[in-house]
């Protein structure tokens, strides 16, 4: 049940937000005030554009095209990329143009050697004197003109030349590249820059493939601390139709992870316009980065924002008639063409509209919170699993050190890189905490004979079981079906896990031909609970689990969390430490979400519309202990939309 009060105030707030976006678009070029209260905006200018902007007419025309659509506080002016250098004589003149308009100008470098004959990325070969000389020249040029430099995310090492092979010797490629890139950071980049400009600050941008960094010399441990700051590559693009298949939740999680590595030194998040089948996807990446509380958003890049062609809505036919968070028609209406032009809205207008919208409430959100998940430095295993879990409504806080004080700890296979992990698990359980380990971690610890059976007599066999039917434990051995009535569930393959009856409890299990496989096992140890989460052989099949299975899974894993949702897959929950939260749907259809919060909550206040949502009690009692004594609300989400709430 919902009721809306103070409707006029709600409509006024929405209208003001729309007018604010329009005002940004119409602001004259000389204005220096910041319309965004909760973040700043930067635009990255690649070197080919830097060379074009040496022409004053081109600079004025392209600037006006972008500025009429989105306000920005800073530009990163690139001096080198892909064997191309900027003209040093033009850099100061271009920088002066922006500074006269109150826009900060920093330098940029992309240490990218180009593509090989197979169209694959080539890093510099740091054993090749020619590449070393180019690197030093680019760094010196940037330091000569700018006091702050950002490195785009190609500062890695992927060549295997004969010189590299000789230098590697008996080391693994990972150890060799990590050692070499620490030397490169210290001497060829930071050292070379400070010889030219002792005051220069160098920021390194780390990309979105963090699970594989160590294999190419990216080092979030020691190298990241050498630089004045770090930056987050939040580009996730399309989650299915791109080579990386990065899930939407990563745009949020990766910023939180890098922030946890260097608190207050992660300068912002970076999003591009590439690989999106529908325009809403670009807005979602911007929003999710800012939901993670990034202080700056960098728009990559200048040429995509400056093109005179209109932006296309893309493949959004299924929800074109819905009132979605990214309202295409409202975005188009908010565009104000510069006087005397026939300009049309482009990518910059999409960014301006999306950014102006969330700025109205971001300041009301507290510090992001989530289930602590431990990823040791230089680790991999069950790669990117936390992002899939985020996409099924489990908030994650990815951290580089074991969270010894967290009430609940999630450990995936990559945590096996910590040789003291089992002892830390035991200590957390003895202190009364809950520890969730995945089937991949269970298998890794068993292979390494790390003593996990001292905690629970649970064994990974790996035998594949194709599951279509699901059951939840009630009491006394009784079960309840977790399939959706009249819906034929798709088969999901799980590895078999053995356990002793009445020693561990399969609170969720799959059934196949009168044979069961545990999906969530629960086992008591000292004062805590150990859970084993069985991950499908294809982790993307988490999205195929029926909604009752996902609801039950969240009910156990989030039993100690202040907010929880019942929802299908592809609905994310972002929570904060001041009784605020966001629910966001990546689905192409409307969805109804039930939200559970603490007992005694009177209402949810929508932070955008000011609508008040009243409690909606569950008619059928749930067997889940986490639902006892909680207050629930029903929230409706349009396709590809979010809603932000305060609990009151």
Model-predicted regions and their roles:
Residues 10-23:
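Bacterial N-terminal signal peptides
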Residues 62-69, 91-102, 143, 220-225, ...:
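Acidic (Asp/Glu)-rich catalytic clusters
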Residues 34-60, 92-100, 104-147, 153, ...:
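Active-site-adjacent "subsite" loops/lids of carbohydrate-active enzymes
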Residues 56-64, 385-406, 413-416:
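A short, well-structured beta->alpha microelement
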Residues 51-69, 128-142, 212-223, 279-289:
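Short, acidic/polar
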Residues 46, 78, 118-120, 147, ...:
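Hydrophobic targeting/anchoring helices
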Residues 400, 412-648:
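A conserved amphipathic helix/loop scaffold
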Residues 22-31:
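Boundary at the C-terminal end of the N-terminal hydrophobic targeting segment
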